Amino acid sequence: MKKIFVINPGATSTKVAYYENTTEIFSHEITYSLEQLKPFNNIFDQLSLRLTDIESLIKEKIPNHKFDAVVGRGGLLPPVDAGAILVDENLIDCLKNRPLLEHASNLGASLAKSVAEKFGVESAPSFIYDPVTVDQMNDVARISGSSLIDRKSVGHALNMRAVAHDVANKLNIPYESGNFIVVHVGGGSSASAHENGRMVDVISDDEVMFSSERTGGIPLKQYINLCYEKTKSEVTELTRKKGGLVSYFGTNDARKIHELMDNGDEKAELVLEAMAYQISKAIGELATVLKGQVNAIILTGGIARSNFISDKVRERVEFIAPLFIIPGEKEMQALASGALRVLNNEEKYNVFEK
């Protein structure tokens, strides 16, 4: 039995969990008010506060346990391969001093290493697993149509690869031998084609389908006009925070839109059907990447809780492959399962190179 501690830092919280193999024994969310975090100038200034709180929690709730590994949520690294990355000084230095963006997940590696050193068995490793910048895209998929812009692999890699592993197990085939299409839709959205264990193409949240808050891909000529009518920050906000459902209804809560639809609101029904329509188009696009050889299609994220959207997607895509619905996110389970595969020598970890 392997004892694994998981750390998932977010903007105003740190989620932690203790697993024995893949069984969750304990979980807790340490929350912070904006006032508590206000004195800190940057994310890494919060390290001591968050670490102290984690250590206190371990001493109180999980006494006398020595962890075989500690795994943290990834961070905004340059493009990396999928799977586990061993936490070392190079990795921490990049996340601290040269991250692509400031984000709480950049603390995951440092927190994991510190906890492993204090509460792990002798030489217990610490990892991050499947950060959002996992990049296994085929070179042909990077071509955008402009020599000034490359398509990027940015998406919900941790959850998408985790649910692909889960469905592969249900189908009794190795993930490394199957072909899967995974769509994650929540506040943002992304979709991916998995071919023989590699995520060979990714549709990011500025392409194709809209979500609760993002516009997705929108008509470019009209978008160019919008750029000249508003500032960069205004356009960014309109497309990334006030797009999607927020743009049409002023809320990112899909449940409220469903209530409107259930009460006869035709606009609500049309927009929700359009969301399912665009999700289906993304699936169709990725099916061509896999040349139609698809073992399963998976819809995940918050929107997968919608029976209306799930059913509408199913109507359009099940001629390609069976559709599996896996609502929500499985980040903590995914981190623990990834670390367990490394400890059991089912996967090898990667070493980050500057």
Task: Please place each PLM-identified region on the residue numbering.
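N-terminal phosphate-binding loop and adjacent alpha-helix
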Residues: 27-66, 91, 95-102
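Short beta-strand-loop/turn "lid" adjacent to the catalytic site in phosphate-handling enzymes
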Residues: 58, 62-104, 125, 133-145
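Glycine-rich phosphate-binding loop plus the immediately following alpha-helix
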Residues: 107-110, 128, 143-179, 187-188, ...
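Adenine-nucleotide phosphate-binding core of ATP-dependent small-molecule kinases
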Residues: 237-292
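Glycine-rich phosphate-binding loops at beta-strand->alpha-helix junctions
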Residues: 294-313
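Glycine-rich phosphate-binding/hydrolytic loop that grips phosphoryl groups
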Residues: 304-305, 311, 324-354
